[in-house]
């Protein structure tokens, strides 16, 4: 009987000693397992999980409800695609702003949109004139030729300002060869004009027209010009398929996707 008690005591002590020695190893193994799991979870993360991305054309268009503001979805999508290309090329110095003139709309409607892409705001929605030989109510004929008195479609880079015969004005650089690259030599600029006035609509059925310049209302010229000057993207859109087929910028975008 005494021997059995001694043996049981010995077995208890032996088990206790083995347990004490094995516990650190079991604990270490558990820690190692958790560390491995954490390492694997971290390795599955990507830089894109932490770096904010530029919002897509769809998200900006829908978030700002630009459809309710009257802006053609296709106009905005093409504008932002071209904007991204120009931004990548380092063309744009003022890359928070994009301006879109939507010539799918008549001149009786507000069709110049200035959008702050950084802060998700429509800064301006207002009237803008087209060239007198581009049409009366609708702009449907376009040219890059001097003395055509027509508007030119496509992407522009805004330059500096000056005081001219129309007052405070903004120089524009056409970025598409054969489409609008004569803009600077044609003196195609943004300026204020008294004929960009809804009062003209009741008299003529459309607002006044320019010699090809995207003219805005005189009272709005200075704040708009100061917002978009010095290297922002201006896109003049029309559902004109000839432009979209020959646009160098849109063609580059299509080639990039191939």
Where are these regions (language model features)?
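Active-site proximal loops enriched in glycine and acidic residues that flank catalytic Cys/His/Asp
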Residues: 238
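Bacterial Sec-dependent N-terminal signal peptides
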Residues: 1-37
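Cell wall/extracellular polymer interaction/catalysis modules
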Residues: 31-211, 219-232, 241-258
């Amino acid at each position: 009987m005494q021997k059995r008690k001694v043996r049981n005591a010995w077995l208890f002590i032996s088990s206790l000693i083995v347990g004490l020695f094995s516990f650190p190893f079991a604990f270490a193994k558990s820690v190692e397992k958790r560390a491995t799991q954490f390492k694997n979870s971290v390795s599955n993360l990507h830089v894109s999980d932490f770096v904010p991305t530029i919002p897509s054309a769809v998200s900006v268009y829908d978030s700002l409800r630009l459809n309710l503001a009257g802006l053609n979805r296709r106009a905005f999508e093409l504008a932002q695609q071209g904007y991204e290309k120009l931004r990548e090329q380092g063309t744009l110095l003022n890359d928070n702003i994009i301006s879109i003139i939507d010539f799918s709309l008549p001149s009786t409607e507000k069709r110049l949109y200035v959008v702050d892409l950084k802060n998700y705001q429509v800064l301006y929605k207002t009237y803008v004139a087209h060239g007198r030989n581009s049409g009366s109510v609708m702009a449907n004929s376009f040219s890059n030729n001097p003395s055509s008195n027509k508007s030119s479609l496509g992407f522009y880079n805004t330059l500096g300002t000056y005081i001219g015969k129309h007052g405070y004005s903004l120089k524009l650089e056409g970025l598409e060869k054969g489409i609008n690259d004569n803009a600077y030599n044609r003196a195609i600029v943004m300026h204020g004009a008294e004929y960009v006035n809804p009062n003209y609509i009741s008299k003529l059925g459309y607002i006044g027209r320019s010699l090809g310049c995207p003219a805005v209302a005189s009272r709005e010229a200075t704040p708009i010009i100061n917002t978009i000057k010095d290297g922002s993207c201006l896109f003049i859109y029309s559902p004109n398929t000839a432009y979209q087929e020959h646009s160098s910028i849109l063609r580059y975008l299509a080639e990039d996707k191939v």
